Design a protein with these regions (language model features):
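Conserved catalytic or regulatory cores that recognize and/or transform ribose-phosphate-containing ligands
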Residues: 1-154
């Protein structure tokens, strides 16, 4: 059986996360659902160029209320259809924090947070615990966890 995980991450990581996503799906019996792969943004290429927080914040100021609603609704629909959340949180973003919360409290699915500096933050620790997920200091440690669960392909 293939587990479906919502892949939460900041906008600045779109390209590097895509490489990891493909590697993970080839190595493990998981399907990573990347919210940036959908058509919620009018110009995905423009979004890929927003590699700094300053540029991203300036871009967000240009979004209409309708676009904001489309983004949030799309993300929540994806989350609802998943078995869990994998959140890359080394570059914390408001969106990823909301996805962690929604996964744990709204949809009651396991939340796995990968981050170096925040795994002991009360919100991260509690949401991972209450959801039945976990917090990991690296992607490698998360991969080791998936192997222990028997999700590695041989």
């Amino acid at each position: 059986m293939v587990e479906r995980f919502y892949l939460g991450h900041s906008c600045e990581l779109i390209e590097s996360v895509r490489k990891w996503e493909l590697k993970m799906q080839g190595r493990y019996n998981i399907d990573l659902i990347n919210p940036f792969k959908g058509n919620k943004f009018e110009n995905m290429e423009e979004l890929k160029e927003l590699k700094t927080r300053k540029k991203l914040l300036a871009y967000m100021k240009t979004l209409s209320d309708e676009t904001n609603e489309k983004i949030v609704t799309y993300d929540l629909e994806l989350l609802r259809k998943c078995d869990g959340v994998v959140a890359l949180f080394n570059n914390p973003s408001v969106g990823t924090a909301m996805e962690i919360f929604a996964g744990a409290y709204l949809y009651r699915i396991p939340v796995y947070v990968i981050c170096r500096n925040y795994i002991h933050h009360p919100w991260i620790a509690h949401l991972c615990w209450v959801s039945g997920g976990g917090a990991f200091t690296s992607r490698k440690k998360f991969e080791e966890y998936l192997t222990k669960l028997g999700l590695r392909r041989y």
